[in-house]
Amino acid sequence: MFPEPPTPGPPSPDTPPDSSRISHGPVPPWALATIVLVSGLLIFSCCFCLYRKSCRRRTGKKSQAQAQVHLQEVKGLGQSYIDKVQPEVEELEPAPSGPGQQVADKHELGRLQYSLDYDFQSGQLLVGILQAMGLAALDLGGSSDPYVRVYLLPDKRRRYETKVHRQTLNPHFGETFAFKVPYVELGGRVLVMAVYDFDRFSRNDAIGEVRVPMSSVDLGRPVQAWRELQAAPREEQEKLGDICFSLRYVPTAGKLTVIVLEAKNLKKMDVGGLSDPYVKVHLLQGGKKVRKKKTTIKKNTLNPYYNEAFSFEVPCDQVQKVQVELTVLDYDKLGKNEAIGRVAVGAAAGGAGLRHWADMLANPRRPIAQWHSLRPPDRVRLLPAP
């Protein structure tokens, strides 16, 4: 009833092949070679990575071992240097005990030779400063400029000073000073001979001193002795400060010029811990003030700088009869100006003031600058003019 389906015949050459019926033939040789090559590269890469990782582990262990070895070597090296620099106490050799070593240990400040004699007729104690040996070098050049300050405690106002000897550690002084003291009072006095290194532009440094209680000295006959210098104690009095000024004298014009340069480390006078300092300059003749000058006031400072010049007419025949007195005062607008300290220079000044004056006269027409330590106004005493 229904027509039969047509019987399929052979495919026509124009009919496209069916992809589902593609036959699986043998794999080509080039494909096999590619697969083998890629697989080999993968295996080689894996092996190489494992090898590198293993090498890194070994290198790390070796570095740690080397570091430990180097650390031990450094410790050993340090110990060897310690042994060389700081040997055992038992290996130290005893220091030589010759005369030179004793001098270095005991006389490192130096020695002073002096003489003592008492004149019963005049009631005077004669103190001779003879010489010093092996003084300590306080200057950069390995030397000192020594001088000796002499006074009888408890009175420090009456004191003498020798001349300065330049660049020497073994000065010969040969100077004698007289103290008028009743014999019955000598037992309670102490003679002080202090050696200083002179410095024109700063505070003089103490090298050492000798203290002789007069109660221990037999003055029935002249005494001459060597004593070792001892370290000088610090000044008991309060520091007032220092002032620097220059002196210049022109003999042909009879003109004396004082230049107040600066001051430093002044005593605090105001409530706020500062001062308002200025300087008064007096020219004295016969102990009387004949001329007066003063600097400007510097506000709120303990280290004022002035650089102010003042001139005085002083004939040549009067230059040895005058003195110059400089007083540093604290200005007070509401109250009285209070003196901080004072310095005197001149032929009758003595000590540093006399040296400064002598240097000025020895160098005419040249300004000679020098630092001076301020002293309490009531302790600045001028000796009678020559």
Curated annotation (Swiss-Prot):
Binds 3 Ca(2+) ions per subunit. The ions are bound to the C2 domains. GO terms for molecular function: calcium ion binding; calcium ion sensor activity; calcium-dependent phospholipid binding; clathrin binding; phosphatidylinositol-4,5-bisphosphate binding; phosphatidylserine binding; protein heterodimerization activity; SNARE binding. One of its GO terms (cellular component) is neuronal cell body. PANTHER family: SYNAPTOTAGMIN (PTHR10024), SYNAPTOTAGMIN-5 (PTHR10024:SF282). CDD domains: C2A_Synaptotagmin-1-5-6-9-10 (cd08385), Syt1_2_N (cd21342). Homodimer. Interacts with both alpha- and beta-tubulin. Residues 1-16 have a biased composition (Pro residues). Ca(2+) 4 binds at residues 270, 276, 330, 332. Ca(2+) 3 binds at residues 199, 202, 205. InterPro entries: C2_dom, C2_domain_sf, Synaptotagmin. This is Synaptotagmin-5. Residues 46-386 are cytoplasmic. GO terms for biological process: calcium-dependent activation of synaptic vesicle fusion; chemical synaptic transmission; regulation of calcium ion-dependent exocytosis; regulation of synaptic vesicle exocytosis; vesicle-mediated transport. Belongs to the synaptotagmin family. Residues 1-24 are vesicular. Pfam families: C2. Its main location: membrane. Keywords: Calcium, Cytoplasmic vesicle, Endosome, Membrane, Metal-binding, Repeat, Synapse, Transmembrane, Transmembrane helix. The chain crosses the membrane at residues 25-45. It comes from the Eukaryota. Ca(2+) 1 binds at residues 139, 145, 197-199. May be involved in Ca(2+)-dependent exocytosis of secretory vesicles through Ca(2+) and phospholipid binding to the C2 domain or may serve as Ca(2+) sensors in the process of vesicular trafficking and exocytosis. Regulates the Ca(2+)-dependent secretion of norepinephrine in PC12 cells. Required for export from the endocytic recycling compartment to the cell surface.
